[in-house]
Each structure stands twice: as structure tokens, then as C-alpha cells.
């Protein structure tokens, strides 16, 4: 079932995972990726970081489409107080996954919905504790040789092949 909104919905992201979530909810939407500086600001907590980025992404698009609802989101993985970004190569992916192997880490996702024409901005952050099983060498090699790790925070996706490493989520 498709739900039609009076005002259009715009996803300020090119993320296939976010697109699939909206489609599975039966929503019609346009995709207009936002390009914002994603650098971590000094002294910024992980929660404030994803909150700011989700708002910045939504606002960057909402300024141009004042009568639309714009959804922005950002996800980061944090372990030992360190933010793990998106690995750019096999070495980075392997190092990230070795750091996560057999341990618990925290995933922060911020999301913002903005309609600048109505002066509406709502932002929230969800925090999840994820425990990985110990990753065997053959599993590691298999995973870093597929395309999945390279466009995801922490080098894995809970809804993808990386789910095989997850022991628990709370």
C-alpha cells in the first residue's frame, strides 16, 4: 500500500538502506542527497554529532523545497570513545571489524524531519548497543572482499551481510 502525502516527502540521502526503509513503510518520496560537511566538531558528543548532521542534511534541502517534508539522517559507530567512519579500503575495513570483533559498541542514528514552509523541525537520536561475535579470519576475508563494508559507518550493515557478525542488539 502506498501512502500519498499532501506535501511531498524528500529523502536528503542517497542511502539505499534508508530508501528501502521508506519504501517498506509504503511511503512515496523523492531522493535529493544533501552534501554537507560531516566533520566531527571538537567537543561534540556522538549524540550531538548525529543530531547536527541529520538536521544539517535536512535543512540543506528544505531551504530549496519549502513546501515539502525533508528527512535527513546520519549514523555513526562508536567504540572505545572513537567514531568509526566509512572504510575507504580493505585495510581500513579489516581494522574496523577487528576492533569490533567479540566486543560491544554503540550505534547512534540521528534523524530530522523539516518543513521550512511550516516552520517545523523535529529531531531525535536513537542509540543501540551492538555486540559482535568473534570474527574468524575466513569470515573477515570473505566480508572485506564483498562490496558491502565500504559505504557504511563501522564497515557493516545490520540489514546486510554484516548481520552475520552480530551476537546481540539492545
Residue ranges and their predicted role:
Residues 18, 38-40, 120:
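Flexible, glycine-rich phosphate/dinucleotide-binding loops
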Residues 8-31:
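N-terminal G-site helix/loop of the GST-like fold
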Residues 14, 34, 116:
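Cofactor-binding loop segments of dinucleotide-utilizing enzymes, especially the Rossmann-like FAD-
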Residues 30-39:
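A short beta-strand-loop structural module common to alpha/beta enzyme folds
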Residues 1-2, 37-38, 44:
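Catalytic cores of phosphodiester-bond-cleaving enzymes
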Residues 3-9, 23, 45-170:
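Anionic-ligand binding patches
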Amino acid at each position: 500500500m502506498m501512502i500519498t502525502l499532501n506535501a511531498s516527502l524528500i529523502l536528503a540521502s542517497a542511502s539505499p538502506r534508508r530508501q528501502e526503509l521508506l519504501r517498506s513503510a509504503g511511503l512515496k518520496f523523492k531522493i535529493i542527497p544533501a552534501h554537507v560537511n560531516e566533520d566531527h566538531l571538537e567537543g561534540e558528543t556522538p549524540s550531538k554529532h548525529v543530531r547536527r548532521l541529520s538536521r544539517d542534511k535536512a535543512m540543506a534541502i528544505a531551504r530549496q523545497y519549502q513546501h515539502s517534508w525533508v528527512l535527513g539522517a546520519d549514523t555513526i559507530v562508536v567504540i572505545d570513545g572513537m567514531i568509526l567512519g566509512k572504510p575507504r579500503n580493505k585495510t581500513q575495513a579489516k581494522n574496523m571489524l577487528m576492533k569490533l570483533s567479540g566486543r560491544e559498541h554503540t550505534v547512534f542514528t540521528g534523524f530530522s524531519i523539516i518543513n521550512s514552509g511550516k516552520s517545523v523541525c523535529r529531531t531525535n537520536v536513537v542509540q543501540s548497543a551492538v555486540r559482535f561475535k568473534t570474527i574468524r579470519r575466513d569470515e573477515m576475508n570473505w566480508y572485506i572482499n564483498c562490496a558491502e563494508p565500504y559505504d557504511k559507518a563501522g564497515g557493516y550493515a545490520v540489514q546486510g551481510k554484516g548481520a552475520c557478525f552480530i551476537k546481540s542488539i539492545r
